[in-house]
Amino acid sequence: MLDPTGTYRRPRDTQDSRQKRRQDCLDPTGQY
C-alpha cells in the first residue's frame, strides 16, 4: 500500500490521534 502506517487515511486512528493530541495539548500529564 501507499501508507502502511496509515498516514493518509486512518479511520480508526483518527479518534486515537485526536484524543492523544488533545491530551498532549490540554493535559500533558493526563489529568483530564
From Swiss-Prot:
Transmembrane segments: none annotated. The keyword Transmembrane helix does not apply. One of its GO terms (cellular component) is cytoplasm. Residues 2-32 are annotated as: 2 X 7 AA repeats of L-D-P-T-G-[TQ]-Y. Residues 1-32 are annotated as: Disordered. Its main location: cytoplasm. Disruption phenotype: Simultaneous knockout of tal-1A, tal-2A, tal-3A and tal-AA is embryonic lethal. In embryos chitin secretion and formation of the cuticular exoskeleton appears to be normal. However embryos display a loss of denticle belts and dorsal hairs. Segment-specific epidermal sensory organs are present and segments form normally. The cephalopharyngeal skeleton is lost, and the head skeleton and posterior spiracles are deformed. In the developing leg, tarsal constriction occurs but the tarsal fold does not form. It comes from the Eukaryota. Induction: Polycistronic RNA up-regulated by ecdysone. One of four peptides (tal-1A, tal-2A, tal-3A and tal-AA) produced from a polycistronic gene that function redundantly in several developmental processes. Required in early stages of leg development for the intercalation of the tarsal segments during the mid-third instar stage and later for tarsal joint formation. Promotes the post-translational modification of ovo isoform B (svb) into its active form which in turn initiates trichome development and promotes tarsal joint development. This is Peptide tarsal-less AA. The gene is tal-AA.
